[in-house]
């Protein structure tokens, strides 16, 4: 009987399994159907069409690496595909809308936007309450007034950089020649670090900062090449990259906390130490403090140095404009030198600050034109901005764009757009700014951002100051000349009339 019962039970279980099989199959089919419906709905929701139902153009292939490493080619491909209209590129699984015209930028910024950047907890990647709290502690150190007060220290550092310049070049008989971009490579980093860390910063700390910058660049390329590194799970698939990220976090924290401790022990002025009070009070998170310093010092190293390189290379070619600029700077030096000597240092600082603040000078035009051709937005590369997301559905360039769509700006095309800059938008002509009112270039000029977004750049006053002080110092000491058949610039000493 036991054997019979066993057979009966086995038979019953088999019958139950057979009866359950269709139910399992039906459930499986239902799940597939639901997933398919959701995918179709998501696809339809993400479709970007114009009022006639025509779908927006999309470049084939993954542009995640290309938009940084081959940005010019990608920009040209987009123009060939879509003309002056917005178009779509792929960034891994994400689709990003590329905008190129001032009217596109206006449409985009009409409502709120949300950052979608690689900057973590830095101020450039946040919004709302956390953004306001970070700015509360960082803004005083990076205000217009703070940048102007730092003129003597910044000027002294630039003079030391200039003293070393002939040693990096090759003698020409009349002067010396060098690839001007090379000595400009880390000047902005040095000046920004001295500004942030104050009196405690020295050559030894700068050497440590350069080592950190090398590691930072490797990590940036890791993240660009592998988007999964932005997630905890993704880090498990590339342990070497994850270890580099952890090493940088540890060394970056040690570097900054060590400076703060040294500044306090020596009773030396250090803006970073004052900002750190926000961490100690619990208003700032330590990672917000560290990530924002990371953004200030590392995120714009290549772009800031490119602005200086572009500035001097074009001045070397455009000698007529250079001569007019030198005459203007000589006039400023005469004014600065002949001020009443009640307190000469303060007077020189005040006069230089006034000159730097003027918007109608050839010096300002020269810097603006260099920035137009090498836009200094929050990215290490010069053509495409980091993405920001639409907060609500919008119509951009005639296309209906859904909420949460990442949008990037092709600054190369925007900064040469004929509607703003005329037919010679691709050429260097600084005096064009005399005829272009700020209202016309508000959405057509990518410097520290466009429109209201330009006000969010924490370091814009510092950048403007160091660009102009470097220009004054170079033109005061040297005339620049292009060298045929090469990338070098020849520098010849000049005597400035005072």
Swiss-Prot record:
GO annotation, cellular component aspect: membrane
Main location: membrane
Its EC number(s): 1.-.-.-
CDD domains the record matches: CYP_GliC-like
An individual GO BP term: secondary metabolite biosynthetic process
Pfam families: p450 (PF00067)
Cofactor or coenzyme needed: heme
Pathway(s) annotated for this protein in UniProt: Secondary metabolite biosynthesis
A single MF term (Gene Ontology): iron ion binding
Transmembrane segments: 20-40
UniProt keywords, alphabetically: Iron, Membrane, Metal-binding, Monooxygenase, Oxidoreductase, Transmembrane, Transmembrane helix
Family matches, as Gene3D superfamilies: Cytochrome P450
Induction summary: Expression is positively regulated by the aspyridones cluster specific transcription regulator apdR.
RNA-binding recorded as keyword: no
Origin superkingdom: Eukaryota
Compartment(s) of residence: Membrane
Entries under SUPFAM superfamilies matching the protein: Cytochrome P450
Residues noted as binding heme in the record, renumbered to the chain: 457
InterPro entries: Cyt_P450, Cyt_P450_sf, Cytochrome_P450_monoxygenase
Record's bilayer topology term: Single-pass membrane protein
Keyword flag Amino-acid biosynthesis: no
Known role: Cytochrome P450 monooxygenase; part of the gene cluster that mediates the biosynthesis of aspyridones. The polyketide-amino acid backbone preaspyridone A is first assembled by the PKS-NRPS hybrid apdA. The assembly of preaspyridone A is initiated by loading of malonyl-CoA onto apdA, followed by decarboxylation to yield the acetyl starter unit. The growing polyketide chain then elongates into a tetraketide. The adpA PKS module catalyzes three Claisen condensations, as well as beta-keto processing and methylation.
PANTHER family, per database record: CYTOCHROME P450 (PTHR24305), CYTOCHROME P450 MONOOXYGENASE APDB-RELATED (PTHR24305:SF235)
Family in the record: Belongs to the cytochrome P450 family.
Name of protein: Cytochrome P450 monooxygenase apdB
Organism: Emericella nidulans (strain FGSC A4 / ATCC 38163 / CBS 112.46 / NRRL 194 / M139) (Aspergillus nidulans)
């Amino acid at each position: 009987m036991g054997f019979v019962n066993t057979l009966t039970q086995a038979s019953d279980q088999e019958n139950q399994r057979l009866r359950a099989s269709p139910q399992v199959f039906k459930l499986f089919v239902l799940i597939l159907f639901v997933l398919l419906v959701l995918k179709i709905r998501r696809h339809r929701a993400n479709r970007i069409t114009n009022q006639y139902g025509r779908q927006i153009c999309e470049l084939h292939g993954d542009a995640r690496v290309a938009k940084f490493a081959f940005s010019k080619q990608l920009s040209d491909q987009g123009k060939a595909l879509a003309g002056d209209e917005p178009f779509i590129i792929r960034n891994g699984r994400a689709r990003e809308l590329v905008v190129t015209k001032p009217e596109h930028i206006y449409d985009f910024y009409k409502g709120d936007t949300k950052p979608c950047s690689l900057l973590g907890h830095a101020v450039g990647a946040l919004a709302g309450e956390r953004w306001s709290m970070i700015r509360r502690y960082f803004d005083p150190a990076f205000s217009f007034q703070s940048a102007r007060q730092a003129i003597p220290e910044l000027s002294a550092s630039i003079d030391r950089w200039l003293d070393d310049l002939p040693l990096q070049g090759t003698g020409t008989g009349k002067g010396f020649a060098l690839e001007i971009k090379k000595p400009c490579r880390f000047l902005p980093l040095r000046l920004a670090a001295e500004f942030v860390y104050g009196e405690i910063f020295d050559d030894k700390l700068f050497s440590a900062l350069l080592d950190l910058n090398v590691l930072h660049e490797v990590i940036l390329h890791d993240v660009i090449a592998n988007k999964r590194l932005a997630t905890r799970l993704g880090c498990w698939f590339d342990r070497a990259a994850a270890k580099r990220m952890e090493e940088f976090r540890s060394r970056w924290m040690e570097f900054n906390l060590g400076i703060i401790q040294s500044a306090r022990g020596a009773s030396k002025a250090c803006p970073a130490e004052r900002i750190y009070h926000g961490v100690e009070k619990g208003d700032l998170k330590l990672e917000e403090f560290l990530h924002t310093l990371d953004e200030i010092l590392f995120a714009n190293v290549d772009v800031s140095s490119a602005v200086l390189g572009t500035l001097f290379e074009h001045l070397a070619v455009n000698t007529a404009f250079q001569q007019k600029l030198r005459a203007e700077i000589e006039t400023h030096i005469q004014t600065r030198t002949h001020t009443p000597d009640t307190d000469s240092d303060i007077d020189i600082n005040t006069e230089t600050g006034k000159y730097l603040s003027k918007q109608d000078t050839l010096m300002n035009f020269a810097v603006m034109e260099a920035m137009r051709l090498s836009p200094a937005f929050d990215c290490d590369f010069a053509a495409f901005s980091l993405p920001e997301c639409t907060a609500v559905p919008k119509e951009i360039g005639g296309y209906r764009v859904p909420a949460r769509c990442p949008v990037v700006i092709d600054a190369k095309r925007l900064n040469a757009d004929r509607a703003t800059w005329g037919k010679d938008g691709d050429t260097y002509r600084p005096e064009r700014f005399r005829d272009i009112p700020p209202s016309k270039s508000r959405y057509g000029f990518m410097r520290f951002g466009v429109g209201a977004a330009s006000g969010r750049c924490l370091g814009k006053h510092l950048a403007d100051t160091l660009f102009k002080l470097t220009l004054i110092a170079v033109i005061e000491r040297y005339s620049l000349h292009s060298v045929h058949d090469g990338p070098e610039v020849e520098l010849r000493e000049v005597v400035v009339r005072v």
